[in-house]
Amino acid sequence: MRTVKRYFKHLVLFPSIIATLQILSFVKQVLTSFASFVIQRKEPHVVRTPEERFRGLEAVGYTFKPNYVDLPVGGGRTLPRVHYVDEGPREAKETMLCLHGEPSWSFLYRYMIPGLVKAGYRVIAPDFIGFGKSDKFTFPEAYSHDLHTQTLRLLLDHLGVSGVTLVCQDWGGLIGLSVVKDSPHFFSRLVIMNTGLPAGTEFSIYNITRIMPFLLWRSFAELLGTSMPVYLLFKTALLNPHPAVLDGYNAPFPSPLYKAGAARWPLLVPITSHTPVAVDMQDTRNFLSKEWKRPVLIMFSDRDPITQGQDKTFQKLLPQAITKTITRAGHFLQEDKGEELSAHIISFINNRL
């Protein structure tokens, strides 16, 4: 009986909180628009995080040489520069493509890369535009699902890779698996971690209640906008955060001007099934269930409230998948159990799982 009472208490409380946050977000937008009109502030369309922000990260394991390529995306006169880690031999027997999500960057994979390289693999870990060492558009509206998928396809073309094992987490899964659908010739295996393929939902009390925690996070993100406290977000999300590690995650964002991409991503997650992203996610689900017959490894952690239960969705879509539960790890499981994840991937490729 107490459980039922708590359920209905939350059912009433969450919409009230979300409505309040939506009102505050609207007020903020009005004030911001008015201030911009009065001040007539001109901001650059593309900014680049100063290199000194990344100094000292070798001390916490980010020791990789930077690689850059200018890609024709975004529709502006300035081509954004995309950063990627590229470690291991170019003629390696396998290539790993490691994709980060919100609001992280290739720094997230620093504990996984050495083990994979030592095993003889090539490891590529890009920073999506708006994150890490890649250039950043200063307006949230410049970011879209299509921007990120197009960027990834162009990067793969630039690198000339094939037979790739996709390693993806969070938004890296939404972007990466969409590209698998559209360009399957690049890929030979999938490693899916703490992500989902949200195709929106039809309105019902059950569905709205089920996604209420995400709606609360989305409303907070919309209210905070480019004031999102990345340092505090990781301090809350990581299980045992060290200040130097938190500095590493916060390094790409010296001011709100650099956070437009991080502010935008939560708002691109589809809530209803009729948005373009929702349609693409449903198409991706259909592709995986009907056409993807190659090997799959699913690794979800036991302490991630954000993607809890999504591993079951992938198991239904991909019945050939091997599934591993990573214990004592949160949403950013690469940070908590990076070396263990690498060991599982190596065993998976060598058919030892």
Model-derived regions: residue spans:
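Flexible "cap/lid" subdomain of the alpha/beta-hydrolase fold that forms the substrate-access gate
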Residues: 2-67, 71-73, 82-90, 95, ...
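Histidine-centered active-site/metal-ligand motif
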Residues: 83, 100, 331
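Short hydrophobic signal-anchor/transmembrane segments that target glycosyltransferases
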Residues: 115-117
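Catalytic histidine-centered segment of alpha/beta-hydrolase-like enzymes
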Residues: 329-342
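Structural cue for short, hydrophobic secondary-structure segments
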Residues: 98-101, 125
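The serine-hydrolase catalytic nucleophile loop
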Residues: 102-113
